[in-house]
Design a protein with these regions (language model features):
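Helix-loop-beta substructure at the N-terminus of cytosolic sensory domains
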Residues: 1-27, 37-38, 133, 151-155
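Amphipathic alpha-helical regulatory segments at dimerization interfaces
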Residues: 2-8, 52, 77, 125-128
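Short loop/turn motifs at secondary-structure junctions and domain boundaries
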Residues: 7-8, 43, 68, 78-83
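Short coil/loop residues immediately preceding or within conserved phosphate-binding loops
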Residues: 11, 48, 73, 86, ...
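Regulatory sensory and allosteric helical modules in signal-transduction proteins
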Residues: 19, 23-27, 35-69, 73
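A short, aliphatic-rich beta-strand micro-motif
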Residues: 84-92
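Amphipathic alpha-helical "output/dimerization" segments
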Residues: 93, 97, 111-131, 137-145
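Short beta-strand-to-loop transition segments that serve as allosteric relay/switch motifs
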Residues: 100-110
Length: 155
């Protein structure tokens, strides 16, 4: 679903971060450079794009990571990679934000209303898929790149 969110929004990459107390931990990373993930550092609830979506329980857009003052905590990730913009929607369960689904772009970008609405639907499905996961620790994030997730030859 994370990959599908990326592809349908014409994004370069996408992420699913899980809420773990006051911070978000990477769970699934699709087609993003490790330098970007390392550079954004620990995402606290209420900071950066995903943390603000979780805190506000609504979509959050960062159209240009290099100029948006609300992305200051993650600017190193943008400087250390080609990623420049993103938008995030909260994944809600029982009225609580449990994760954030985000799409990332290589140039300044503002998503369309349909891209946001589609990701909100994906977030509902992800919420259902994550039910019961609260009792297990967040594993190391799963990094995926298109060549690693391509269909087998002959398909």
């Amino acid at each position: 679903m994370v990959r599908l969110a990326c592809e349908l929004a014409s994004a370069h990459g996408s992420t699913l971060f899980l809420v773990e107390g006051p911070v978000l931990r990477p769970y699934v990373i699709y087609n993003l450079p490790k330098g970007y993930i390392d550079g954004i550092g620990t995402i606290r609830v209420g900071t950066q794009c995903c943390g603000r979506a979780v805190a506000q329980k609504r979509p959050w857009i960062v159209s240009d990571m290099l100029t948006d003052p609300l992305f200051a905590d993650g600017r190193k990730g943008a400087l250390d990679s080609p990623i420049r913009a993103g938008f995030s929607v909260p994944v809600l369960s029982g009225g609580q934000a449990i994760a954030a689904l985000a799409c990332h772009y290589m140039s300044p970008h503002t998503p369309s209303a349909i891209d946001i609405e589609r990701n909100e639907v994906f977030a509902k499905l992800i919420s259902i898929a994550l039910r019961g996961r609260e009792r297990t620790p967040v594993p190391e994030p799963y990094f995926a790149w298109p060549e690693r997730v391509a269909a087998p030859s002959g398909s």
